[in-house]
A protein has these predicted regions:
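Short cysteine-rich clusters marking metal-coordination/redox-active sites
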Residues: 203-208, 232-235
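Conserved RNase H-like, two-metal-ion catalytic cores of nucleic-acid enzymes
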Residues: 1-77
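Conserved DEDDh/DEDDy metal-dependent 3′-5′ exonuclease domain
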Residues: 49-136
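Acidic, Mg2+-coordinating catalytic module of metal-dependent nucleases/exonucleases
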Residues: 84, 133-198
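Cys/His-rich microdomains that often coordinate metals
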Residues: 209-213, 236-239
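Short metal-binding segments enriched for Cys and/or His
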Residues: 229-245
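Short Cys/His-rich "knuckle" micro-motifs
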Residues: 213-220, 242-245
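Short linker/helix segments within small regulatory modules
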Residues: 218-229
Length: 245
């Protein structure tokens, strides 16, 4: 299973606001007030087994032209079996789809997804679920300070270079958080079972593929079959299979 860790960076939205009450304006947003719609500034990704992420971005002279970014991301997303990101289900994939359909690109086939923000909210009670906080709390790396987005829109090459570095560091941080949280994620998508040369199923962790595990307990089912629970010695996650006699 090919697992892709990814992150995108987008511009803000520029609006012309004329209102007597700001809360009413926000509630009854009129798209006619859009002076500049958002677009994608860059994207970074890496396969789970890779050491370094890749990145693509707009150019300083055309900071609002994200066609090449979307095309590159469209290709790599199409190669993945599972997507991993922080808030990727609500932000990254929807932002990508919006720009993809803008350019009349075909949809990427549905993927398995692990959103580390959802995992953090479901299984824990962290004081904050922001990626920067999780990195500090879990002691697994760091998240850089955000770039000056306006400078990038103004064509600043130095700030664009920093954004590319920032984008890659987000992917590295997401990978570290994912690996730390994975063993607690009981509904994590499972890798297909591994078989040896004679076709017998090998008891490898379906989450991290670590080859060593311990038997925890077995339990009978109403159907008369039995299930065996294992714990991985690598990621310490649990999984259950049919009892092998």
């Amino acid at each position: 299973m090919k697992k892709l860790i990814w992150d995108v960076e987008t511009t803000d939205l520029e609006l012309l606001i004329r209102t007597y009450q700001l809360k009413n304006y926000i509630k009854y947003f009129d798209p006619k007030t859009i002076r500049r719609d958002w677009s994608m500034l860059g994207a970074s990704w890496m396969w789970l087994d890779d050491d370094k992420p890749k990145v693509i971005s707009v150019t300083p002279d055309k900071p609002l032209d994200d066609y090449e970014v979307i095309c590159a991301l469209h290709k790599v997303l199409g190669e993945a079996d599972m997507l991993i990101g922080h808030n990727c289900d609500q932000f990254d994939i929807k932002k990508f789809n919006t720009r993809a359909i803008f350019y009349d690109l075909p949809p990427v086939a549905p993927k398995l997804s692990v959103d580390t923000l959802k995992v953090a909210r479901k299984y824990f009670k962290f004081t904050s679920n922001k990626l920067s906080y999780l990195c500090d709390f879990l002691k697994v790396g760091f998240k850089d300070d955000s770039p000056d987005w306006q400078k990038i829109l103004d064509g600043c090459q130095k700030e664009l270079r920093y954004m590319r570095k920032y984008n890659k560091q987000d992917v590295i941080a997401t990978k570290a958080v994912y690996l730390k949280l994975m063993s607690y994620h009981h509904t994590h998508p499972k890798n297909p079972p591994t078989r040896d040369i004679v076709g017998e199923i090998v008891n490898i962790c379906p989450k991290c593929r670590y080859p060593e595990s311990i038997k925890v307990r077995s339990r009978p089912l109403a159907s008369g079959r039995a299930r065996q629970q294992y714990q991985c010695k690598g990621c310490f996650g649990y999984w259950t299979t049919d009892l092998i006699k």
